[in-house]
Amino acid sequence: MFELDYRLENDCVRIGSLPLCTILLMKDANYPWLILVPQRADVSEIYQLDADDQEQLIWESSFVAERLMAEFDGDKMNIGALGNVVPQLHIHHVVRTRTDPAWPKPVWGAVPARAYAAGALEQRVAQLAAVFETSTFKPA
């Protein structure tokens, strides 16, 4: 049975879900930063998904990346599945701009995470839910 890793649960807020993945927003206001987590138990690598799920993951990742770049006018989309700290398969999608605090370096460890201001987190969640509104997206 699929259960979200407690570290992802603590560091993120749920935006909603697509047919395969839960969509999470990282609680770091420095960047538009989403994480896709395939809703499959005991999976830490993409190759451990069956072929249909691998194809669905690529579709969902591309869908999320394209919508994020359009919404936030990014210069570069950083996508990565590291898993060194949290082994549960999760794929980071970070919109990067030439003016963000870490540019051009990777976001991890570059600057301290910045909490969302009061009310801003809820606004961002609503904004993203609207961005992903489709027949297959289910808001959290």
Can you describe what each PLM-predicted range is?
Residues M1-L89, H93-A140:
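HIT superfamily nucleotide-processing domains
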